[in-house]
Amino acid sequence: MNPAHLLVLSAVCVSLLGASNIPPQSLNLLQFKDMIRCTIPCERTWGEYADYGCYCGAGGSGRPIDALDRCCYVHDNCYGDAEKRNCNPKVVSYSSKCDKRTLFCYDAPGSCARFVCDCDRTAALCFGDSEYIGRHKNIDTKRYCQ
């Protein structure tokens, strides 16, 4: 084999090995975002729900500080239940529809996709029904979430 071809092949192999260590992107996050958009008031963006309270966003600890934060707490627990079923909620794709602030999940009942869709649907509907309190965004979690 030509040394130049061997060098290129080696570089590709090294790149693929490095890429295999990169965690998968949260494919489901895009679907969850669409569900949230379906249920929240127009003046809010879905991004306002990240880093809200003790549970909306990455991780979570302590007691939820309000009803909206409780939605995230329940959602986190639902994802935990999905993982116990060997279902990765952060990467599974599901079939859903939004129609006039109503959400529908279409995957087969009992399937991983349906379970995750139901987790996201329940949380998004909860977001739509809960008051957003601006001062609970970006709170000091070390102080309020222990």
Swiss-Prot record:
Its cofactor is Ca(2+). GO terms for biological process: arachidonate secretion; lipid catabolic process; phospholipid metabolic process. GO terms for cellular component: extracellular region. Binds 1 Ca(2+) ion. It is found in: Secreted. Residues 1-19 form the signal peptide. Residues 20-27 form a propeptide. GO terms for molecular function: calcium ion binding; calcium-dependent phospholipase A2 activity; phospholipid binding; toxin activity. This is Basic phospholipase A2 beta-bungarotoxin A2 chain. It comes from Bungarus flaviceps flaviceps.
